[in-house]
Design a protein with these regions (language model features):
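Generic structural signal for helix capping and beta-alpha/helix-loop junctions
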Residues: 59-60, 104, 128, 159-160, ...
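A short, acidic, amphipathic alpha-helical segment used as a generic capping/interface helix at domain edges
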Residues: 228-239
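Gly/Ser-rich helix-loop-strand patches that form or flank binding pockets
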Residues: 108-158, 240-241, 245-283
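Short glycine-enriched, charge-decorated loop/helix-capping segments at active-site entrances
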Residues: 65-72
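Charged docking surfaces used in two-component/phosphorelay signaling
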Residues: 98-106, 227-230
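A short helix-to-beta-strand connector/capping loop
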Residues: 89-95, 216-221
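Intrinsically disordered or low-complexity boundary/linker segments at protein termini
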Residues: 1-34, 123, 140-179, 270-283
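Small/aliphatic-rich secondary-structure junction motif
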Residues: 17-65, 164-224, 243-245, 271, ...
């Protein structure tokens, strides 16, 4: 009886840890179908509900009283319907929404209302410039949005269970609750190894490398390095760790903020052939 109770508790904790609601904003890039299939496969692995959102702006034709709102809404819904017809949704519950407004505002609202655990982002939602890693829209989501963690999925990437995550940060101080939940969920589901790389930069402060018990319970190995930026630390240690997912932290002046002020991020500045998990601000 005691063993059955223990199994019940373990299974209950496992279910609590798993991500339940995922959000995918879609654009018009040629990678959208591939990205959406990845999102469905990811959701299936977690038994999660998938929200697919296409956001459109409202315009009034100059010199007329014609409001294009209803036309754009209809076209957006038709676009979503066409997209979903090209996807194998498997057993995943998929909710599609055509919503008007500014991208960041809409996604923040949806995240709150639907209790989103993770946003899956393609590098270029609308951009066709091959020199760009993160396009204007995707970069804006990563840099400006206050909300859940994001997963940047490389173009054409096929879903597979995560085995090894390299987590890089220059400060391990955590003051907010639940920011590590996506990592805990990945670890609970895939039993993946998580290596923590603490990067000492010229802006290092006393206590930055104090790893609390919560973070210690998530990671399997901790190492330190000294580099000018967190990004350079990742480059230096990437091959020795050979991860199949990177994990960084979104901060006001963090990994994606300091080096590039514009929303667009060029491939010459940063690119990744594996998914990048961007956690919410820790402080």
């Amino acid at each position: 009886m005691l063993i059955l109770y223990h199994i019940f508790i373990v299974n209950l904790i496992f279910k609590i840890l798993l991500m339940k609601n995922l959000l995918v904003p879609v654009g018009t890039s040629k990678n959208t179908v591939s990205h959406l299939q990845y999102a469905v496969d990811f959701a299936e692995a977690f038994g999660a509900k998938l929200y697919v959102v296409h956001i459109y702006k409202v315009f009034t034709k100059a010199g007329t009283m014609i409001n294009l709102d209803h036309i754009l809404e209809r076209e957006s819904k038709e676009y979503l319907h066409d997209l979903m017809s090209k996807i194998d949704t498997k057993n995943v519950e998929v909710v599609t929404k055509a919503l008007k407004g500014k991208v960041v505002d809409v996604l923040e609202l949806v995240s709150r209302v639907a209790n989103i655990d993770l946003i899956l982002i393609q590098p270029r939602t609308n951009s066709v410039n091959d020199e760009v890693f993160l396009g204007e829209t995707s970069g804006k989501i990563i840099k400006q949005m206050n909300g859940p963690a994001s997963l940047i999925v490389p173009e054409g990437f096929t879903f597979k269970p995560t085995q090894h995550i390299l987590m890089a940060m220059k400060s391990a101080i955590i003051r907010k609750e639940h920011v590590l939940d996506p990592l805990k969920s990945l670890k609970a589901k895939f039993k993946c190894k998580i290596d923590l790389l603490l990067v000492k930069t010229p802006y290092h402060n006393e206590g930055d490398f104090d790893v609390n018990d919560e973070l210690k319970s998530v990671v399997d190995d901790i190492s330190t390095t000294e580099n000018a930026t967190t990004f350079q630390g990742v480059l230096r240690h990437y091959e020795s760790h050979n991860p199949d997912m990177l994990c960084v932290v979104r901060r006001k002046r963090g990994f994606f903020m300091k080096k590039w002020e514009k929303n667009v991020i060029l491939k010459k500045d940063f690119s990744s052939s594996i998914p990048v998990l961007v956690l919410s601000e820790l402080k």
